[in-house]
Swiss-Prot record:
Protein name: Methylamine utilization protein MauL
InterPro entries to which the protein is assigned, alphabetical: Cupredoxin, MauL
SUPFAM superfamilies linked to this entry: Cupredoxins
Gene source species: Methylobacillus flagellatus (strain ATCC 51484 / DSM 6875 / VKM B-1610 / KT)
Pathway of action: One-carbon metabolism; methylamine degradation
Function per UniProt: Probably involved in TTQ prosthetic group biosynthesis.
């Protein structure tokens, strides 16, 4: 029987965990702390794993007049390559895949001066695959990119 409103049922209920007796309020606090730690550990694990998956890089290629400027990167599967048109003429860059598929890098097929187009190396690209960047308008503009797959993606012998 309750004497007044301050005496709540949950304050009088006791639980036994092992040899320790805890009130219901202590259980709630314990569960909250446990859930908080579980959340933090799970979030940390997911961020660690996803940072490995997010290891793709963004590379820059510069297009000036009738040639690509020399580049110093080796593309890996999943890397994005941004191609910036620094010339004062229009270009129309496309990529030829190793299997012969051709992909335009601009919806209009024209890359105006100052415009940047992007291409992402396919995730299923294999070590040694060669992707050729060319211009539809100026066929002399050509760059061959050989993919170097990370060791973790190479098949075991």
């Amino acid at each position: 029987m309750l004497r007044n409103r301050t005496d709540a049922v949950h304050d009088r209920v006791r639980f036994s965990i092992g040899t320790r007796v805890m009130s219901s309020w202590s259980i709630v606090v314990w569960m909250f702390h446990r859930q908080t730690w579980q959340f933090l550990l799970t979030t940390g694990f997911i961020l660690c794993i996803s940072s490995i998956a997010w290891s793709a890089e963004v590379h820059q290629m510069e297009l000036t007049h009738h040639e690509f400027e020399p580049w110093s990167f080796v593309p890996k599967p999943g890397d994005r390559i941004d191609i910036h048109n620094h010339s004062d003429i229009v270009h129309a860059i496309y990529v030829t895949y190793p299997n012969g598929i051709v992909v335009n890098l601009s919806e209009t097929a024209a890359q105006l001066p100052g415009m940047t187009v992007s291409w992402t190396v396919p995730e299923d690209a294999e070590d040694g695959d060669e992707y050729v960047l060319q211009c539809w308008i100026h066929t002399i503009i050509r760059a061959a990119l050989k993919v170097k797959a990370p060791l973790s993606q190479l098949p075991e012998p």
